[in-house]
Amino acid sequence: MSAEPSSSAQASAPTVVSVAPSKNGRTPGKAHKSAKTALRRSYISPSVKTPFEKRMEKEKAQQAAKQLEKELKEEKENERQRKVNIIKERRARKEEKQREEELRAKMSAKKLQRMKKREGRSKKING
């Protein structure tokens, strides 16, 4: 250590650096932070960038097309279900008719048998 500390202090006097006020006026420890701004993506070409309104119009058109497609699909499915129901009803009627026909045939066979039996009795008696 030398005997002239005051002269060296003057030569290397601390320089005062003004501290920039940070966000919300909080300076301690934040002087090195710069104010941040919203990100602007400059790497997207202008031909790709579209205004919000145009994008919304396009989205509405797509939604309308989807809605129309959905309605057409529902209509087609309803028509298919109607045809399936008609076929099922037709088959059920046919089966019911067949069952009634078999029942009639069975009943008429029994009736014929009874009539033959009566006829046979009368022949024996009359015969």
UniProtKB/Swiss-Prot annotation:
One of its GO terms (cellular component) is nucleolus. InterPro entries: Cgr1-like. The keyword ATP-binding does not apply. Residues 1-127 are annotated as: Disordered. Residues 1-22 have a biased composition (Low complexity). Residues 52-114 form a coiled coil. It is found in: Nucleus, Nucleolus. Residues 51-105 have a biased composition (Basic and acidic residues). Pfam families: Cgr1. GO terms for biological process: rRNA processing. Residues 29-39, 107-127 have a biased composition (Basic residues). Keywords: Coiled coil, Nucleus, Ribosome biogenesis, rRNA processing. Belongs to the CGR1 family. Involved in nucleolar integrity and required for processing of the pre-rRNA for the 60S ribosome subunit. This is rRNA-processing protein CGR1.
